């Protein structure tokens, strides 16, 4: 759910750097996420998987 993801991101990120409404619109695909809050939130909410040695 975009609103829950963006709310979590606003807690994890510095709130001054995040506009929750913009984040939600980007998450829903209604706004491009080029260099905006959506890109920032993706780093917190969906970090890259690290390949662990086996």
Curated annotation (Swiss-Prot):
Salivary gland. Its main location: secreted. It is found in: Secreted. GO terms for biological process: neuropeptide signaling pathway. InterPro entries: Opioid_neupept (IPR006024). The two short analogs SOR-C13 (AA 42-54) and SOR-C27 (AA 28-54) bind to and inhibit calcium influx through TRPV6 expressed in HEK-293 cells (EC(50)=14 nM and 65 nM respectively). Since TRPV6 channels are overexpressed in a number of cancers (including breast, prostate, ovarian), these analogs have potential application as diagnostic and therapeutic tools to detect or treat TRPV6-rich tumors. One of its GO terms (molecular function) is calcium channel regulator activity. The keyword Cytoplasm does not apply. Disulfide bonds join 2-23, 6-27, 9-41. One of its GO terms (cellular component) is extracellular region. Keywords: Calcium channel impairing toxin, Disulfide bond, Ion channel impairing toxin, Neurotoxin, Pharmaceutical, Secreted, Toxin. Paralytic toxin that immobilizes a mealworm for 7 days. Inhibits the transient receptor potential cation channel subfamily V member 6 (TRPV6). Member of a multiprotein complex. Belongs to the opioid neuropeptide precursor family. This is Soricidin. It comes from Blarina brevicauda (Northern short-tailed shrew).
């Amino acid at each position: 759910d975009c609103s829950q993801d963006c709310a979590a991101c606003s807690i994890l990120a510095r709130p001054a750097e995040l506009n929750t409404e913009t984040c939600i619109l980007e998450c829903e695909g209604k706004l491009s996420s080029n260099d905006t809050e959506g890109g920032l939130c993706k780093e917190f909410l969906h970090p890259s998987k690290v390949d662990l040695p086996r």
